[in-house]
Amino acid sequence: YIGGLLGWDLAFPEAARSLALDGADLLCVCANWGHAPAQDPGLALAEWQTYIHARALENAVFVAASNRVGEEYSYHFFGDSRIVGPRGETYAFIEEEVQEAYAIATLDLDAVRKTREELQLMQCRMPPAYRSLVRRY
């Protein structure tokens, strides 16, 4: 099963967890992640990479994250698309700023099952302990 996330969804762990609990083995992310001129480009890139690896690790899923490159008005999009495995390992990536490229990786979906069995991420959850996560802000 493939789950889809759009851009900013990546910043919210609940979205990825919900898809994983529904049986997703692979999360596909399409994003326009970048930074404004006054923002630190290194920080924006670090956030992007951290979110991808965190969603893969915390849910024991593959994440294929595609990010836009180029400029629009004053906003800069840096690319850095990547495929990450259920243990957070990078399977493939496209260097920053590369235009119109693609990455290919062979994904063993059995690795998702094995990782989940080993780490017990879903079984050890304690939903009553964090009911506030589903309350409106």
Language-model regions, residue ranges each:
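Cysteine/selenocysteine-centered motifs that mediate thiol-based redox chemistry or coordinate metal-sulfur cofactors
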Residues: 18-21, 111-137
